Each structure stands twice: as structure tokens, then as C-alpha cells.
Amino acid sequence: MKLGIAIPHYGPALSSAADLRRFAVEAERLGYVTLWCGDRLFLPTDLQGDYPGTDYPIYAERGNRFADPLTVVGTLAAVTSTVRFNFSTLNAPLYHPVILARALTTLDFLSDGRVDAGFGLSWMRDEYDTLGLPWSQRGARLDDVLSFLHAWWTTNPVEYEGQGWSFPRSQVGLRPVQPGGPPVYLAGVTEPALDRVGRRATGWLTFDAIPPEVRKTMWAEDGVDEALVDFFFTHTTMDEFLEAAERVADLQLR
């Protein structure tokens, strides 16, 4: 098992740039394998819906102070040398594929190949509405992003026909350090999301326990060996461990 930790780049935990840098350096020293960033453009005071899987709102004080994840990773890559960076998740459909390709390739270059690309759809419809993007097409937009990134990272010159846009045949001089580009990890627990993981990703970002037989059946249909898919549980709790530690400590103090 490998352990990662979330970067405190949002909410009250975001205190200063110096604290962020110290956090990254110390996490690397302690042996964490990956530092994780989230992605949120804004959080309306009147949301159109609650966070998936809950019946409570995500309060604005957590989301009204959210540093740009791409900028944060670039900053922290400069003060570290071994720890990797990933996103849980970067809401890929909200970005134009060309802008995202350049940004991720730049981060891969600046970090000497220590960046992974963790993508999700964003659960918040308000973000799509504000950017003028169709909520119903979010899955198709993610597929478009994935296809363009693959083209950008594996071909040169690059030419691409997207959904309602095109990229003219062009030489792309800045190439990724990692062969084939940063590894792609996808989030989601729905059937379309799991199907996309099996077809298009190196690994799966999950916070839910999907029955193994369901995963294996779906991925087998795509010819995917589950053993080759990396699993990242992006939300974990230490409650049971803390309770056990407290019981042991109590015994020692008696």
C-alpha cells in the first residue's frame, strides 16, 4: 500500500504560500508517495444540488477560498524532488482541451515527470451553467479531452477534429517527460464511468466500494484485466485506527 495526502489548498487550511511549500517538503520527507489537489471554480451560496451521496449542503466557507490546482502543483513541484502529484479530481470537461494539454505537459516538464492526471466530471452543475457548457454533454466532453490529450502526447505534428472544434495540423515542440504523457486516472462509480476507466485509464479514483464481480464483469467486456488497473481510494478515514490507538494508550497509562 502506498499513501498520499491532500494538499491544503482550499478552505480555512489554505493559510499562506510559505505554509503550502513547507507542507509539501515535509510530506515528501515523511515518505508520502503522492500529493493530491482538488478542483473547484467557485461555490454558490445557493447550490442547485447537494454533494452526491449526501443529504447535506457543502458550505461556502470550504469552497470560497480555493487556489488553482494547476498553479499549486507547479509551485510545489519546484520545492520537491521525488513526491508525485495528482488531482482528485481535475474537472476536465470544464477546460478547453488545448489549454489543458499545454498546462499538463508544462507541469510534467517542470516536475521532471512527477505529474499524474486525475480527472472527474464535476458534480456541480452550477460550474457548467456559468461557463456556458451543456451539463448533458459532460461525459462526451471528457471523452473529447482524453482523445485530444492522447493525440497531443503521442503524435507530432498534432491534428485533431473535436466536438464542435478543431486543432489544425501543428508541430508541438514541448513533449512530455513521461512516455505517452502523464498517466490518466479517472473518477466515478456509475456504469459509464467504470466503462471509461476500463477503456481509457491507467487507474481508478474511488471513494466507494464497488462489488468486485461488477467491476470484473464490466471490464472483462472491454478486455481489461482488473489486476492491471491501479486503485486509489481518495477519501479514507482513520477512525478505527484512532480508536484502537486510544485503547492501547489507555492500557499503557493504567
Model-predicted segments: where are they?
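Active-site-adjacent structural elements that line small-molecule/cofactor binding pockets in enzymes
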Residues: M1-R254
